[in-house]
Regions:
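Structural preference for beta-strand elements that scaffold enzyme active sites
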Residues: 48-49, 59, 84-86, 110-116, ...
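Conserved N-terminal beta1-alpha1 strand-loop-helix module at the mouth
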Residues: 50-80
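N-terminal amphipathic alpha-helix/helix-capping segment at the start of soluble metabolic enzymes
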Residues: 6, 10-60
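Alpha-helix N-cap and loop-to-helix initiation/capping positions
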Residues: 65, 69, 95, 156-164
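Glycine-rich, aromatic-flanked loop segments that form ligand/cofactor-binding clefts
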Residues: 27-47, 114-141
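Hydrophobic, small-residue-rich alpha-helical packing segments that form membrane-like cores
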Residues: 122-140, 144-205
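Glycine-rich, proline-tolerant flexible connector loops at the mouths of alpha/beta enzymes
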Residues: 82-111, 115-116, 143-156, 192-196
Length: 205
């Protein structure tokens, strides 16, 4: 079903692989905030692993994956042992919404289904609807925080961005963890400042 790409032959296979890849990069410098617990912490062990292969960029492909192809990919990720899988941007299309429903109905009880949405109320509501009934779900919201996107594209001040982040977080909680009809699901929230690499550190934290 999938077209395999020819692999490039290395002159000396594995010769340049690092024995300990963790030592390749300098550790991220923590941010000293006395009233916060996590910004100053350092990563000292392997983090949680999440597959995000099934969402976002796929929408821009000239020949995007069909639902049967997405299903095959999803089950391959389960075979590989992923416990957190970001499956879609369910508010982007009916295809993504329908595939999300398939993932929810076929995921093992120890696998979290993650979905992505912008910080806009109607999109958040549609996104939460897509994972209703999941055993474990992660709602991943993102918001423009870099100066270019926040100021030029969306015409928002830093105060506007913070207010929107709080508003959206409260909305997600009201639709999930605090909603009486959503208690069968173990809910988690992920928030991403966009683009984090171009966002001033003090503002992002």
């Amino acid at each position: 079903m999938f077209k395999s790409m020819p692999l490039m032959k290395a002159a000396k296979p594995f010769a340049n692989f690092l024995k300990d890849p963790l030592k390749k990069y300098r550790a991220f410098k923590g941010v000293a905030l006395p009233n916060r617990t996590w910004p100053s912490k350092s990563i000292t062990k392997a983090p949680r692993w999440l597959s995000t292969d099934l969402r976002d960029g796929n929408q821009s492909l000239p020949d995007p994956m069909s639902i049967p192809e997405k299903k095959e990919y999803f089950h391959k990720l389960l075979e590989l042992g992923f416990k957190e899988i970001e499956v879609s941007f369910p508010s982007a299309s009916q295809t993504d919404f329908d595939f999300t429903r398939y993932a929810v109905e076929n995921a093992p009880s120890d696998v979290s289904i993650q979905v992505l949405t912008q910080s806009r109320e109607h999109l958040v509501r549609r996104t939460v609807e897509s994972v209703k009934g999941a055993k474990k779900a992660i709602i991943h919201i993102y918001l423009a925080t870099s100066d270019v996107f926040r100021d030029v594209v969306f015409n928002m001040t830093k105060e506007d961005a913070i207010a929107k982040a709080i508003e959206t977080t409260k909305l997600v909680r009201s639709l999930t963890k605090d909603h009486p009809e959503m208690q069968e699901t173990e809910w988690n929230l992920e928030f991403s400042p966009f683009l984090i690499i171009d966002t001033p550190t003090d503002f992002a934290v």
